[in-house]
Amino acid sequence: MVKVNENYLKLKAGYLFPEISKRVNNYTQANSSSKVIKLGIGDVTEPLPKACVKAMGEALNEMGTNNGFKGYGPEQGYGWLREKISVNDFISRGCQISSEEIFVSDGSKCDSSNILDILGSDNLIAVTDPVYPVYVDTNVMTGRTGETLQNGTYQGLVYLAINEENKFQPEIPKKKVDIVYLCFPNNPTGATITKQELKKWVDYAIENKSLILFDAAYEAFIQDKNIPHSIYEIEGAKNCAIEFRSFSKNAGFTGVRCAYTVIPKNLSGQNSKGDKIDLWSLWNRRQCTKFNGVSYIVQRGAEAVYSSQGKKEVNSLIDFYMKNAEIMQNKLRSAGFKVYGGDNAPYVWIKVPDRMTSWDFFDYLLEKADVVGTPGSGFGLAGEGYFRLSAFNSRMNVNNAMERIINI
């Protein structure tokens, strides 16, 4: 009989969001008249920018003509999109990232998982706690984490707690780690990092020859001009960091699928003999073997994000969701909750009432207010006692959900 990858058996009972869906489905089946408002999964709700819809429509029509038809595209992405990304997202901020260093993909979730294909399995990995579950689970699946401990953590990972005490800023590891996952603006806490703090991480990585995997999926929601949008705003980062970006949240592409990963050409690792190996070439080889590229139609839609109309419409979407976050902050604070995040990210991170666990509070909100959020413990041991609410919803739903919560 065929043997399975037993690393999958080390995973916790279920990925966080399917577990939430299961509980909500059980509740709605038992309470058919309930009108549940979901502020849990970070999926967008508002329509795509008109500029993107128009561009994709035109691209679709092109595909129906002999002259305009496109077959397989470049695995790295079309040059015209990569150039727009380079100029608008990096060079405009003083980051010297060339179009060749940008790889277009169908999602940063996929890329942050697939990047492990080019990294050795014996690297020591550090993650924040709480953390986006994908970082941990994909390392478990590939056998990099060791055994599961009784408290639900993994023997082979280094956990960097982020909490009220350290203002949700992970401390630099006391020992050398090979790979560090950083996500700012942070999912799930909504915290941000200053240039000064990020510089400490870059300095650590250079000194220890470590690699930073920097998830900037929520950078478009930054309101504070002093907060960095990219790790490449920090001197030296091109020698130690890979950055993941996405069109999912800023342009509403969760159902369209387009993202990109930046791998600087001078970024390198080493083989077992100690020889330098450049990571750009490995990732390019990986993509050419395992990926056929993002569709032409979708890439034209992504290109439209950088048009003058597209920029206005994307900014309007961001303003809409950030207003939702502001409403949530104000209402929850007026009800006596401790609230974090929501200033530069579309998530608010709240302290649950005393003597309640995160899952207790989940059930409490569901049963008393018909509101769904995400238990902090689902993001890691240090997330216990917290709860995430997402600003990705309609204004009416956000207002109604807040009224329900404060009137419990």
Curated annotation (Swiss-Prot):
It is an enzyme of class 2 (transferase). SUPFAM superfamilies: PLP-dependent transferases (SSF53383). Its EC number is 2.6.1.83. GO terms for molecular function: L,L-diaminopimelate aminotransferase activity; pyridoxal phosphate binding. Pfam families: Aminotran_1_2. It catalyses: (2S,6S)-2,6-diaminopimelate + 2-oxoglutarate = (S)-2,3,4,5-tetrahydrodipicolinate + L-glutamate + H2O + H(+). PANTHER family: AMINOTRANSFERASE. This is LL-diaminopimelate aminotransferase. It comes from Prochlorococcus marinus subsp. pastoris (strain CCMP1986 / NIES-2087 / MED4). The lineage of its organism: Bacteria, Bacillati, Cyanobacteriota, Cyanophyceae, Synechococcales.
